[in-house]
A protein has these predicted regions:
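Loop-centered beta-sheet repeat module
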Residues: 197, 203-249
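Active-site rim elements
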Residues: 107-108, 163, 202, 209-213, ...
Length: 419
């Protein structure tokens, strides 16, 4: 069965070609070992001079380990699931206990660390028209479209998009998609983002999550993506999202006439591209976000969080942005004689700029959110499904703060185990 054939291969957007078995099993995973040569104190941005000479610190992690299961029922009906383990954790859920004077109660039973990130049923009517219903990946931005670790050179996911957008963005709803010639489209209706989960350090990133055992959907969100493949190995893409973020939490606060006119209109727009040639690969992205009524939303959140409500406490800015580009060259291409054609050794560089908090005129500024970052390193692929990664990165903050260099080593896999 075929779901999509993109220039940048994404396991979540493809299923294996025709085979004797109807079952598809696949997945991806990554391990990351990092040494950070800057302070890990939580006050390093509010009092940077006090932590300038702090010792380095190390962090070892398994950011993602994912299993895909797909099945072709026949006659155009297919299903797919994705189970993701993040950081080897379990997670927790929050409930509002009215038997305990309306206090918030934390229960260790469900959360974002072990998640069912996809679970959908699809009916394919034609290559140009397919319908999915269930829990879907929302392909807004280059990272959400191709979030598997062999689709970027860095040890960790591209930092700018990962900071300001939900990642991997998954939500429950319905999707219409298809491909005709050099074009592919997708339109989604999903549960809207929650403005009470927006914040200073990550913009709307946490807005797609839910601390409850259900996803609030008082407001709907609308997302779309269009891909163009003008020439071989090149993809150009536009994507975006719109929804109202206010009045989309629990309990429903629409009765509160004081804030009835506060909508929290949320607009996200993104452009991304990928060129994957025989020896040279380049990828890039540009993302922009807007939230109306940011000042009022920040005030409401601050008042709510004083009652231990499970919302983000810091203010959200009116805008956020991210832009990045990376390029890699296969050094083994210089030595064609006698080498294994399956192996690749990329020398790569990446630059990105992002700011998760661009305030409205009446909001305070927090300049540490304005960042540039460079990364250089190598990716060795002994097989097309496995990558060993090494990099040096340097995060540049404004002059009153301390810069943040680090070195990282990682290993990742991505592929189908059975078809």
């Amino acid at each position: 069965m075929v779901l999509a054939a993109l220039a940048t291969v994404s396991l979540s957007a493809q299923v294996a070609p025709e085979r004797s078995s109807r079952l598809t099993v696949g997945g991806y995973g990554e391990v990351a070992l990092t040494r950070n040569f800057y302070s890990d104190n939580v006050y390093r941005y509010s009092h940077p001079a006090d932590y300038k000479n702090d010792p380095s610190h190390g962090r070892f992690d398994v950011p993602h380990a994912v299993i895909y299961l797909g099945y072709d029922f026949g006659k155009g009906w297919t299903m797919q699931t994705e189970i993701e383990f993040e950081h080897l954790g379990t997670g927790s859920a929050v409930e509002k206990e009215y038997t305990e004077a309306g206090e918030w109660e934390l229960e260790v039973e469900k959360g974002g660390e072990v998640a069912l990130e996809q679970f959908w049923i699809q009916k394919s009517f034609a290559p140009q028209f397919n319908v999915r219903l269930g829990h879907l990946v929302v392909p807004v931005g280059g990272l959400n479209n191709a979030h598997e670790p062999l689709n970027y050179f860095t040890v960790y996911r591209p930092e700018g998009e990962y900071t300001i957008l939900p990642s991997t963005w998954h939500d429950t709803g319905i999707s219409l998609w298809g491909r005709a010639g050099a074009w592919r489209y997708e339109v989604l209706v999903i549960a809207g983002l929650d403005a009470f989960m927006y914040d200073r350090d990550s913009f709307v990133k946490h807005g797609a999550g839910s601390p409850y055992e259900f996803k609030v959907a008082n407001k709907l969100g609308f997302a779309a993506r269009i891909d163009c493949f003008p020439v071989q190995d090149l993809r150009l893409s536009l994507s975006g999202y719109y929804g109202q973020g206010m009045h989309n939490s629990y309990p429903n606060d629409m009765w509160n006439t004081r804030y009835a006119d506060i909508k929290g209109h949320t607009l996200l727009g993104a452009f991304d591209f990928a060129y994957t040639g025989t020896s040279f690969t380049v990828r890039g992205n540009a993302d922009w976000g807007f939230v109306s009524d940011a000042t009022t939303i920040s005030t409401v959140k601050r008042n709510l969080s004083s009652n231990n409500a499970p919302y983000r406490k810091t203010p959200v800015g009116r805008n956020a942005c991210a832009a990045g580009i990376e390029a890699g060259y296969d050094l083994l291409h210089l030595f064609p004689g006698g080498r294994n054609p399956e192996q690749k050794l990329y020398l790569f560089g990446r630059y990105e700029y992002y700011d998760s908090y661009i305030p409205d005129a009446d909001q305070p500024d927090y300049p540490y959110t304005d960042r540039h970052r460079i990364a250089v390193g190598v990716n060795w692929l002994p097989l097309p499904q496995i990558a060993v990664k090494a990099e040096y990165s340097h995060r540049f903050l404004q002059s009153q703060y301390n810069n943040e260099p680090s070195i990282s080593l990682g290993v990742a896999y991505m592929g189908f185990f059975t078809r």
